[in-house]
Amino acid sequence: MNGETNVEQIQIIDSNKHVGETVKIGAWIANKRSSGKIAFLQLRDGTAFFQGVVFKPNFIEAFGEEAGTEKFQEIKHLSQETAVMVTGVIKEDSRSKFGYEMDITDLEVVGASEDYPITPKEHGTDFLMDHRHLWLRSSKQHAIMLVRNEIIRATYEFFNEQGFIKIDSPILTGSAPEGTTELFETDYFGQPAFLSQTGQLYAEAGAMAFGKVFTFGPTFRAEKSKTRRHLTEFWMIEPEMAYTTHEESLDIQEAYVKHLIKSVLKNQQYPLDVLERDTALLEKYVSEPFKRITYDDAIELLQKEEANNDYDHIEWGEDFGSPHETFISNYYGVPTFILNYPKAIKAFYMKPHPTREDVVICADLIAPEGYGEIIGGSERATDYDYLKEKVAEFGLSEEEYSWYLDLRKYGSVPHSGFGLGLERAVTFITGNEHIREAIPFPRMLNRIYP
């Protein structure tokens, strides 16, 4: 390549460290346009997108009239997603969101790309989902995945700093942890097994061994739902903490979510710019305390305001729908904890309220801007006899849950935990409209390809 064998190869994201230098970058052509003696290539390399400028007179000067002209014409006709090794000088570009560009002095085609299906024109969602393996290359999807990666990194950082141990819960289980019928069943050497809906029960066992633990893995729900908030396969972060009250758990939940937002703001400003996310709102969620209200308060508020708002009437004892959650969180303008739900609509393992028989000690965290529940948590029931009764009441097998009941027989202590849905958190922090774009290859009702 023009004899420049000793030129350093860098990544686009590191352009700010090489302004004025001649470097090489292995990239793909995301888009291009040309006019007369100049061509503009939008380049991507997996770390970022930026512009490469090709000026015909520079190629003629470097390679001669005939070779330079031929090379320039070849570049003008390169197709979308052609893989290239480009050499050039990094320059600042105040007009772009990224802030830098390259004056290209040489280009070598590494891999051809013919008839790339996702063109710069508009495509329908089904078409893009059928080509998800290619759609991931687009600037928006790339930005969302960078934020997702940052949230995962920040999750490990937060819990490591807080003294948690990560444990791995099984994906195949012999029982339904939540006592639900929304299960994917498979054959396990002649006996039924299920894809796990939660790692929580195993995390509780871990908390009794290590004090503070968290699980992080895929979970599965056979929900026949087509809403913008639901996937059939998604990832959950589920901490459990021994000798921890629910109020203490709420403090940890708030600190954790704020840590995620702060980390994205600090380390992923470029993706947020690409996504045009309102970072002033994210800053607000970090700086202001989260709101805490009871389920009773929420029902009273919804009933009081229903005449002036577009959501269905709700009675005490009913669970909230998406419009209810949207109104509540927007009413307060910050992430909002709703505490102490009726026990009839919550899971069997939650601790009963000390002064009320009709509610349990729990909370859901509702994200603002219509993003809904992103965390569910509770203090766990610790009394063996009570939990045994709840297992029977929910129609669960005492034999299958005997190991879980054992945790209440051998040194039972107050403990609390929660679960955060990774994709819901990604959708909220990126300001995206649909959860399907918050995971590389979404699994939804009628969607298992690619």
From Swiss-Prot:
GO terms for biological process: asparaginyl-tRNA aminoacylation. It comes from the Bacteria. GO terms for molecular function: asparagine-tRNA ligase activity; ATP binding; catalytic activity, acting on a protein; nucleic acid binding; transferase activity. Its EC number is 6.1.1.22. Pfam families: tRNA-synt_2, tRNA_anti-codon. InterPro entries: Aa-tRNA-synt_II, aa-tRNA-synth_II, aa-tRNA-synth_II/BPL/LPL, Asn-tRNA-ligase, Asp/Asn-tRNA-synth_IIb, NA-bd_OB-fold, NA-bd_OB_tRNA. The keyword Iron does not apply. It catalyses: tRNA(Asn) + L-asparagine + ATP = L-asparaginyl-tRNA(Asn) + AMP + diphosphate + H(+). Keywords: Aminoacyl-tRNA synthetase, ATP-binding, Cytoplasm, Ligase, Nucleotide-binding, Protein biosynthesis. It is found in: Cytoplasm. One of its GO terms (cellular component) is cytoplasm. PANTHER family: ASPARAGINE--TRNA LIGASE, MITOCHONDRIAL-RELATED, ASPARTYL/LYSYL-TRNA SYNTHETASE. Homodimer. Belongs to the class-II aminoacyl-tRNA synthetase family. This is Asparagine--tRNA ligase. It comes from Enterococcus faecalis (strain ATCC 700802 / V583).
